[in-house]
Amino acid sequence: GNTLVVVEHDPAIMWAADRMLDMGPGPGARGGQIVFDGSTAALKQAHTLTGDYLSGRKQVIDLHSTQAGAWRQRAVQPNTPRLLLEGARQHNLQNISLEIPLQRLVCITGVSGSGKSTLMQDVLAPALLRHFGKATEAPGAHDRLLGADHLSDVVFVDQSPIGKTARSNPASYVGAWDAIRQLFATAPLAQERGYTASKFSFNSGDGRCPTCGGSGFEHVEMQFLSDVYLRCPDCNGQRYRPELLEVRIQRADRALNVADVLELTVHEATQLFAADRQVLRALQPIVDVGLDYVKLGQPVPTLSGGEAQRLKLAGFLAQAAQTTAKSKQPLASKGTLFLFDEPTTGLHFDDIAKLMRAFAQLLDIGHSLIVIEHNLDVIRASDWLIDMGPEGGSAGGQIVAQGTPDTVRQHASSHTGAALRDYDVAMGVDSYAECNTERKSRENYAKDAEEIQKNLGNSFATSAQPLRLLRSEFEP
């Protein structure tokens, strides 16, 4: 007799829901409306972003697309550089050895408690950090790690806060504020008064508000309670002295001062500064990771864990773009290994599509990605899978299967393989139909889907609602 209201992006939960409320149409200021209210079956027919993905009109990754810029899987060849980890036995890991191909998207999969985080966070990451002379805790028990010389660095991109100061914001994090300060320094009034770009810094210099030091807030320590940030009473949160705010630049039909620019969302800024190449180049990585709804001056401590993780990714994209532009080489001689722990948590289908495009940018210039992931769109699009299990806890810690997604999909005892097969049926993905054409006819798909769901248990969907939707999809 209870009622459940769930914020969810997993299609299995959506299919099982009795009622769907779809918010949008866009993120941030472009959202805040109910764009659909009804059943999941009706949502699939509705022309909303969520409906487009649930119905298959849009796909997070179209593996068969030949369009320029489309995701492409990278084959693992015999000469592909690899990391070799031998004898990992930390916590429940059962003396496992594995090869990890580099310059590829590698997903570590498996049920909860199967040893994924232990493998990445307790063994692999500390061992690599120690190899590069970085401060880290002692690596978990293992025999040896080989192949790290193929890399120039390793970065673990987690959801921890980027910083604790309110002065740090998305614009400064990716280097866009430097370019914007240069624009203000060229304004007629700034040149008349002799203001340089440094005058428009909120981190240093005498142009910032002397009361709050350029943060726009006063920090009040509450001892045993969470600290409180109060809007600065002198600058009213605008960060700068009044005379600095008199300097304006004209963009489109707006005359903007520095405080006005910091209040722009990234989406608004890319439109207003479309003709300013340096600003646009610096902001583009934030757009690429799907954070164009945040404000340029939003303090980074106020970002969620997922937003902080994506902003870190945007920072690496910006850094990679600058390095590539300076060296004029499209491919890094020794790439960086990026480690992610469930980066799709809390993301919509469309956000995941943007995230995958950002991943592709890193791969295209020679970097490597290892991702702990449960999202089936990401798993099926990866270049290599390492499936842990078979169960959790003491019944896990083994490598059930490793290889391409197609290899794992066909593995008889892999929960991930079973989930991939089930997902292909539910979403009407061609790969399942192609591998079953000779032994399954179209009228038997609903029966096949029912059998898969019975066998999977908690691996994918267990309610009757997805089954009814599957039948409606495949029965005449």
Q: Each predicted region: which residue ranges?
A:
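Arg/Gly-rich low-complexity intrinsically disordered repeat tracts
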Residues: 440-460, 468-471
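Conserved phosphate-binding elements of NTP-dependent enzyme cores
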Residues: 1-436, 448, 466-476
